[in-house]
């Protein structure tokens, strides 16, 4: 069976297995868990102590707690990626065996944060790291008493790259011949044109 929140594909087996784990906690606690997972997906971090307190009644082992967070994260982010409305998501989760109250509780949380979650996912999509700064210098030796030939110019690039937003920037240095720099510049301009046509 195909599900919209899975991108019109079959639901992964591990998600099916964890639906029964979600059913072990109350719908109210599931809503609070969803709030914590959404906070994490939106970049606010996750409070594991609060999650452990919420799952204490169900006597979850640490593996069950992690699996619960993972399955909620998958369901919420995947539904947002595929622009699934709350009603459809609720229906699909019930088809997978999640009780109606639980599905309604999860979907209320999802609907409240759907647009901000989609914006966050869009901002993080296809982004390996962030360019913080660029520096460059051209060395061109006109003549030298030690060299018989005049060397071609060298372009020294220094890129400052942050692995994630808020992380300290790491310098990446490289030296290129003038020809290689021209090829790099042409490729970057072509990539910029293609990306501007996409978004």
Swiss-Prot record:
Keywords: Cytoplasm, Nucleus, Transcription, Transcription regulation, Ubl conjugation pathway
Keyword Transcription: yes
Superkingdom of the source species: Eukaryota
Family annotation (InterPro entries): COMM (IPR017920), COMMD4 (IPR037356), COMMD4/6/7/8 (IPR047155)
Cell compartments where the protein resides: Cytoplasm; Nucleus
Biological process annotations from GO: signal transduction
Location (main, coarse): cytoplasm
Described purpose of this protein according to its UniProt entry: Scaffold protein in the commander complex that is essential for endosomal recycling of transmembrane cargos; the commander complex is composed of the CCC subcomplex and the retriever subcomplex. May modulate activity of cullin-RING E3 ubiquitin ligase (CRL) complexes. Down-regulates activation of NF-kappa-B.
Self-association state and partner proteins as the record states: Component of the commander complex consisting of the CCC subcomplex and the retriever subcomplex. Component of the CCC (COMMD/CCDC22/CCDC93) subcomplex consisting of COMMD1, COMMD2, COMMD3, COMMD4, COMMD5, COMMD6, COMMD7, COMMD8, COMMD9, COMMD10, CCDC22 and CCDC93; within the complex forms a heterodimer with COMMD8. Interacts with RELA, RELB, NFKB1/p105. Interacts with CCDC22, CCDC93, SCNN1B, CUL2, CUL3, CUL4A, CUL5, CUL7.
Name the UniProt record assigns to this protein: COMM domain-containing protein 4
Provenance organism: Bos taurus
Recorded name of the encoding gene: COMMD4
């Amino acid at each position: 069976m195909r599900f919209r929140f899975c991108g019109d594909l079959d639901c992964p087996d591990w998600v099916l297995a964890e639906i029964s784990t979600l059913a072990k906690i109350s719908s109210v606690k599931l809503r609070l868990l969803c709030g914590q997972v959404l906070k994490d997906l939106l970049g606010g971090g996750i409070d594991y102590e609060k999650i452990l307190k919420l799952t204490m009644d169900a006597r979850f082992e640490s593996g069950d707690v992690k699996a619960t967070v993972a399955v909620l994260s998958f369901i919420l982010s995947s539904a947002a990626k595929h622009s699934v409305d709350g009603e459809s998501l609720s229906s699909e989760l019930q088809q997978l065996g999640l009780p109606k109250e639980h599905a309604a509780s999860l979907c209320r949380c999802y609907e409240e944060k759907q647009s901000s979650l989609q914006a966050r996912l869009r901002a993080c999509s296809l982004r390996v790291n962030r360019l913080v700064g660029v520096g460059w210098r051209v060395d061109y030796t006109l003549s030298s008493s030690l060299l018989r030939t005049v060397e071609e110019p060298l372009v020294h690039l220094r890129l400052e790259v942050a692995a994630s937003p808020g992380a300290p920037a790491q310098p990446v240095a490289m030296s290129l011949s003038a020809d290689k720099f021209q090829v790099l510049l042409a490729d970057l301009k072509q990539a910029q044109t293609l990306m501007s046509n996409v978004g």
